[in-house]
Amino acid sequence: MQIIEITEPKQTDCQQKLQIAVGIDFGTTNSLIAIATNRKVNIIKSKGDKELIPTTIDFINEDLIIGNNKGLRSIKRLFGKTLKEILNTKTLFALVKDYLDINSSELKLNFANKKMRIAEIAAEVFIYLKNQAEKQLKNNITKAVITIPAHFNDTARGEIMLAAKIAGFEVLRLIAEPTAAAYAYGLNRNQTGRYLVYDLGGGTFDVSILNIQEGIFQVIATNGDNMLGGDDIDVVITQYICNKFDLPNSSETLQLAKKAKETLTYKESFNNDIISINKQTLEQLIFPLVKHTINITQECLEQSGNPNIDGVILVGGTTRIPLIKDELYKAFKINILSDIDPDKAVVCGAALQAENLIAPHTNSLLIDVVPLSLGIELYGGIVEKIIMRNTPIPIAVIKEFTTYADNQTGIQFHILQGEREMAADCRSLARFELKGLPPMKAGNIRAEVTFAIDADGILSISAYEKISNISHTIEVKPNHGIDKTEIEIMLENAYKNASIDYTTRLLQEEIIETEALISNIERSIIELTTLLSESEISIINALFDNIKYAVQTRDQTLIKHSIKEFKSKIKNIWIQNIININDLRK
């Protein structure tokens, strides 16, 4: 935990200059920047007196243009994505096909005769927001709280932080968008409850369940659809207009559809010289999409383990559509909080949090975040992350583990810190062993491991075996001996090696599962020796030798081929009636 040091200003003729920090909502469709003073939020306006700045980047005659609704759109969807993912995802490829540098080994886009990474491109949006704020506030702006989707992975978080850093920002905090929205509604003021945040923006849909305990926010469940938003509703309306009124599927027709949608949020009908459409027709057209979001929301609530909620918070301009509020109320019969402009709820929360972090007149006690992920080494050297980087503390996470081999009487736990996929690439924090376990078959032991970080950043790890009632607890300080520079180096290495690490992990998981397969079938063969002929045993042993050799080569393709060959040939042996082939890896 960090405590803000309070410095009393000296008695001089010059008033002490206040620090300034802004809140930024980097949205899929639009972005906003705001500043809070004495808990009153002022949203910075751009050229043309607009608060919503389209998150688009275009180059015209080598001049950078931000927010003209042309050029590259939906940059936010590209955070954390690899070149391979872009090429294999139709919707993502469509976003960047005109800019993609297919000759690069990593994801880069061609802009103004430059090859730029996503973070470098997104930085241009941050620079634009920063410039607008500095012009209006007549002050240098270097500190910011930035909102991110609750589902953002470490790579995506790293890229958005890098983009902000390139733009000249010191990122005080990354906070989840649902947390920011709840903060904007004042739910941080010693309130307790569970809130559902329904966020339907222009390009994405996210839903989160927040548990709030006296100012501590915890996202306990998330769900969503990264390819569903207000833009998809626009497409449905456009298609209807084209068919109904014999209009071309053009940008002009799309703008007409958007105008109709916006008008029908507060009127019963929309009419002009070209088209006419009423609210009932609109609701019939978009009902399947709205129903889809309700289903996702219900799934999220089920995942949270508790169906009870104290309120629904609406975020995103698309939630202005009355049908959405109606369907949410039908589904949950709960109070819907919508008195803050849904386009601005997230940035308002970010601005309020920014003020809370730097205001010198407040004796603020800040809740810290986990600087690097914490996890356990699994069999094969794989890291199982328990608490992810940037998780707010205090926090406690429980996971269950089991034994890999038969008759294990102890489990060794190796505690690690870092973002890499393999234990050898992470920082070792501590080791301990849970001893005296009853000898049982592999997989039957149930060891419950709890990672708990208190408000002072002290990590306590406890392991409890349910059958024997054996337990062990240790305390470690995850930040001991590691400074900010080392953290940055570890994050940079994780970013550079993300693709290789992921491939290595997949291979190791393949090997572990294959070794388990070999062990299980060898055990079955020993039990069935008297039922098999010598030729059958010879065939099976030859197949096993192929699999074992494939594992030794660490060739994932060869491993899969050897298993496939085994499954194919074993069908010709009577043992197939005893060994369930469906249990083999597909």
Swiss-Prot record:
GO terms under biological process: iron-sulfur cluster assembly
Stored InterPro entries: ATPase_NBD (IPR043129), Heat_shock_70_CS (IPR018181), HSP70_C_sf (IPR029048), HSP70_peptide-bd_sf (IPR029047), Hsp_70_fam (IPR013126), ISC_FeS_clus_asmbl_HscA (IPR010236)
Name of the protein in its database record: Chaperone protein HscA homolog
The family this protein is said to belong to: Belongs to the heat shock protein 70 family.
Sorted UniProt keywords: ATP-binding, Chaperone, Nucleotide-binding
Gene3D superfamilies in alphabetical order: 1.20.1270.10, 3.30.420.40, Actin, Chain A, domain 4, Substrate Binding Domain Of DNAk, Chain A, domain 1
Organism annotation: Rickettsia typhi (strain ATCC VR-144 / Wilmington)
Function summary: Chaperone involved in the maturation of iron-sulfur cluster-containing proteins. Has a low intrinsic ATPase activity which is markedly stimulated by HscB.
Gene: hscA
